[in-house]
C-alpha cells in the first residue's frame, strides 16, 4: 500500500512516476524500500492513466461489497459478549479519569 501511496502522490503532482521517484518519496518518508516491489507496481500500472486506475479501484470496491453476501453470524453468545465489552471499557475509562483529578502533572 505504501508503494501505491507514493505512486499516487507523484501522479497527483502532475509527473509520470518513475522507479527513482517512487523510491525517493518512500525514502523521504523513512520507509525501507524494496526495489523489486517498486518495479512490480510500475509494471502493473504501465500505460494506465492514474484517474482510470482510481476509477477501476472504486468499481472493484463497490462490486466486492454487493457481491459478498451476508457474513456468517456467531450466534447470541457473541452478540452478548460484544455488548458487554463497551460497558466494561467505559467503566475502566471512568476509573482512569478519576486518577487525573489531582492535577499533579509531574508527581
Swiss-Prot record:
InterPro entries: P1/P2_N_sf, Ribosomal_P1/P2, Ribosomal_P1/P2_euk, Ribosomal_P2
Pfam family, one: Ribosomal_60s
GO biological process: cytoplasmic translational elongation
UniProt PTM comment: Phosphorylated.
Any one annotated GO CC term: cytosolic large ribosomal subunit
Compositional bias per record (Acidic residues), positions renumbered to this chain: 92-101
Gene Ontology terms for molecular function: structural constituent of ribosome
Start and end residues of each stretch annotated as Disordered: 86-107
Complexes and interactors: P1 and P2 exist as dimers at the large ribosomal subunit.
Family, per entry: Belongs to the eukaryotic ribosomal protein P1/P2 family.
Physiological role: Plays an important role in the elongation step of protein synthesis.
Entry protein name: Large ribosomal subunit protein P2
Source species: Trypanosoma brucei brucei
Organism lineage string: Eukaryota, Discoba, Euglenozoa, Kinetoplastea, Metakinetoplastina
